[in-house]
């Protein structure tokens, strides 16, 4: 592929991300600063080391089908600059609810689900001195989670993020139990990190609500479901919020805080302040919307990338190379709004793919059983 063709594809891929970013800001879902926080602290870092095909190959194309299938018809299809309002990045300050000192209020944290994300959430909170109550359905799963937490802590020590002495100290801050009620009875914050099954999550939230103290904030790490979907079974919808971590949670600083229709500004501020105090970079999603910020941007990129492959302009490997060695590192450093020109990007809107159906290239992978790395 020659340089001119590569640059043309790169600009279109960036325009797809930019178009959806602007649409989110215009809709009041978040501000420009929130978009760039998500990019620089999570998905942009992924793009800088692996393009969209490499990333989704690791996740699994069957899961991509679920995520993209729900979003492909919802992401922006604006074809001209006149259809959007350019956000003023300089005025983007993030969520500005009532300020609270959250560090002293979330000392005891229950993590429900000790799997891939749950154990990472637990170990990061433990490193920062929180007393963590890790819960799952079997002692085997909990034992395995502690083993993986130890590995994660050693990895942090190996790169100088923590000292060797902090490994064992952090582990002493993690208690395990298969009794859900016991795990949440003293919790200031409960983070549900179970499988992406709404009925399961509702059952967990109903039990948590009946067992946790009335002051507890109840959160879900779901990347799919919004707070009203699981919080509706509780008697404290004002204290229910989404806290969407990125994998691996102890290495990527970004999180998305998703507010439900009843979530109080005090709770959002508590969560935001607490996570900022331990070094996380929260972006507040102010309106319930499918895919939040992160998945919508990733699907916008993937749709344009797959369209480019289907048209024969580039291979998947070439697309990954363009992202990984082109704009990926730039986006990881300064985000989308600090990286691109509105006039340059908006000129490309009319050229972008606007299909509302899943690309054939994805459907072919699913049909052939090519599900990626499992």
What is the meaning of each model-derived region?
Residues 130, 135-162:
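Glycine-rich phosphate-binding loop and adjoining beta1-alpha1-beta2 segment
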Residues 1-8, 16, 22-114, 123-130, ...:
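NAD(P)-dependent Rossmann-like dehydrogenase/reductase catalytic/cofactor-binding core
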Residues 116, 140-141, 155-217, 225:
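Rossmann-like NAD(P)-binding element
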Residues 145, 208, 227-231:
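Hydrophobic packing residues within well-ordered alpha-helices of enzyme cores
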Residues 112, 177, 193, 220-222, ...:
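Structural motif
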Residues 119-120:
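Residues forming the Rossmann-fold NAD(P)(H) cofactor-binding site
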Residues 1-12, 217-287, 291, 295:
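Rossmann-fold dinucleotide-binding core
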């Amino acid at each position: 592929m020659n340089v001119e063709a590569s640059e043309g594809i790169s600009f279109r891929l960036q325009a797809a991300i930019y178009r959806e970013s602007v649409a989110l800001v215009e809709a009041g879902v978040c501000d420009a600063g929130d978009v760039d926080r998500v990019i620089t602290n999570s998905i942009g870092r992924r793009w800088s080391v692996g393009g969209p095909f490499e990333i989704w190959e690791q996740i699994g194309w069957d899961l991509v089908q679920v995520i993209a299938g729900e979003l492909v018809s919802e992401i922006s299809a604006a074809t001209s600059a006149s259809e959007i309002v350019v956000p003023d990045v300089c005025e983007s300050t993030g969520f500005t609810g009532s300020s609270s000192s959250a560090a002293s209020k979330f000392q005891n944290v229950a993590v429900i689900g000790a799997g891939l994300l749950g154990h990472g959430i637990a170990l990061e909170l433990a490193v920062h001195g929180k007393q963590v109550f890790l819960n799952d359905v079997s002692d085997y799963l909990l034992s395995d989670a502690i083993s993986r937490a130890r590995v994660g802590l050693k990895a942090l020590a190996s790169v100088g993020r923590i000292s060797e002495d902090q490994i064992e100290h952090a582990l002493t801050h993690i208690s395990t139990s298969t009794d859900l009620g016991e795990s949440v009875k003293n919790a200031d914050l409960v983070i549900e990190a179970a499988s992406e099954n709404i009925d399961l999550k509702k059952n967990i939230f109903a039990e948590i609500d009946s067992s946790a103290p009335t002051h507890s904030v109840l959160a879900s790490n779901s990347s799919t479901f919004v707070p009203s979907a699981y919080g509706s079974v509780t008697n404290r919808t004002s204290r229910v919020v989404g806290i969407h971590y990125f994998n691996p949670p102890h290495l990527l600083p970004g999180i998305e805080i998703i507010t439900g229709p009843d979530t109080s500004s005090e709770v959002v501020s508590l969560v935001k302040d607490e996570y900022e105090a331990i070094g996380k970079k929260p972006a507040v999603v102010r309106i319930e919307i499918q895919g939040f910020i992160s998945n919508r941007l990733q699907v916008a990129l993937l749709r344009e990338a797959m369209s480019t492959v289907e048209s024969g302009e580039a291979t998947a490997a070439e697309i990954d190379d363009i992202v990984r060695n082109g704009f990926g590192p730039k986006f990881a450093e300064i985000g989308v709004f600090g990286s691109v020109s509105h006039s340059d990007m908006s000129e490309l809107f009319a050229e972008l793919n606007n299909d509302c159906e899943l690309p054939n290239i994805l459907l072919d992978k699913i049909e052939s059983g090519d599900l990626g790395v499992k």
